[in-house]
Amino acid sequence: AKPVDSFARAAELEAELKRNVRGEVRFDRGSRALYATDASNYRQIPIGLVIPRDADDVIAAVAACRKFDAPLLPRGGGTSLAGQCCNVAVVLDFTKHMNRVLEINPAEKWARVQPGIVLDALQRALQPHQLIFAPDPSTHNRCTVGGMIGNNSCGAHSLLGGKTVDNVEELKIVLHDGTQMTVGATTAMELAEIIAQGGRRGEIYAGLRGLVNEHSTRIRANYPRI
């Protein structure tokens, strides 16, 4: 998507977001400056900021940005070292409201969380059950699980417990076109069923299967062992 031209439509976009988002919408210069950097040397002043209260706010923000052809950038704790949190986009900050543990299943050893939860907060919630979330980057007291997923973060014990990608069972996602779906590890039979069902989800999975079939040999030969 193209950035809003010189912020020419920023006022319209801000008004659209304020009409449809219950959380905070900030387009003032001070807020934009606060979100212009992460832990790297990069700096990009965003179009504006949305602090969603819930998933409905996220869906509304996606719809507004789609309407105005504005990029959207989900943000965690801003601990990235390579500018991942910096862009001329509408920034979604999940850390204020969408930061909870929703469910813990000790028997099956999984937890369901919101993207803005800080890793240490998750670890504290898991501790009574003698469980941990294996990846442990050095920024564990301020990085978020959503940011870890976006970055596929590792840590000192990742050789033992794996990277973030190895510790995520499924994700509930919303795409730029508004499609909502749950994704995760998929068997060949499940993949065939999803594609047969058609719709946007089936279209996406069929496209992914096509990419795998076309490029799998090259990927396996060249993908780094990390």
Where are these predicted regions, by residue range?
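Extended, hydrophobic alpha-helical segments in both membrane/secreted and soluble proteins
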Residues: 72-74, 81, 122
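N-terminal flexible segment immediately upstream of the FAD-binding catalytic core
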Residues: 1-67, 77-109, 138
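FAD-binding subdomain of flavoenzyme oxidoreductases
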Residues: 100-226
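Charged, amphipathic alpha-helical interaction segments
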Residues: 57, 70, 152-155
